[in-house]
Amino acid sequence: FKKIFSENYTCILTTSHELIPLMARSFAVSEDKIKVWGQPRNDGLFQKNDCREILGQLFPDLPEYTKTVLYAPTFRDYGQVQLFPFKDFDQKQLEAFLDEKNMLLFIRTHVAEQGSAAPYLGKRIRFLGNEQAEDVTGILNIFDCLITDYSSIYIDYLLTDKPMIFL
């Protein structure tokens, strides 16, 4: 069975050169049949997306800005995410900082927690929900920085070679 199965492949795709030997053994093919093509879902990260055009379409009333930050915490089955988990968190201080630095902060929560962002929203803090972007992966490259915890979104964002902050 393995011989018949493995002889029918022209090539097998993988995401990195390090996986070539493993994939070759797993599919019982020679390493030259393994091609590194990355993750198709990340193709959008390598396109030239116009940040102002995309955000302008999603949020027509945005104030002037120079930098954009995406805050994407992980969904937790055991309770609602606390978006700003600091005892000394000060909403007014965050808004003043964003205003002073001419920045926008976009909060992206799991679809089950969309209401949790409401108390934090304002002129420079916006909610980027499924209504605006069903899959945020294709537009990750429009953000200048990512803030997350242990969400796997950071793995895709690594491809942008931009700063990340882990909470």
Model segments located where?
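A short beta-strand/loop micro-motif in the catalytic core of glycosyltransferases
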Residues: 10-16, 104-106, 146-147
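Alpha-helix capping/helix-boundary segments
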Residues: 18-19, 113, 152-153
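A donor-sugar binding/catalytic signature common to diverse glycosyltransferases
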Residues: 133-167
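Structural alpha-helical scaffold elements that stabilize or flank donor/cofactor-binding regions
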Residues: 5, 62, 97, 138-139, ...
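Conserved catalytic-core segment of nucleotide-activated headgroup transferases in glycan assembly
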Residues: 40-119
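Active-site and donor-binding regions of nucleotide-sugar-utilizing enzymes
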Residues: 1-46
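Nucleotide-activated donor-binding/catalytic signature segment of Leloir-type glycosyltransferases, i.e.
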Residues: 113-131
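Acidic, amphipathic alpha-helical patches
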Residues: 2, 94, 136
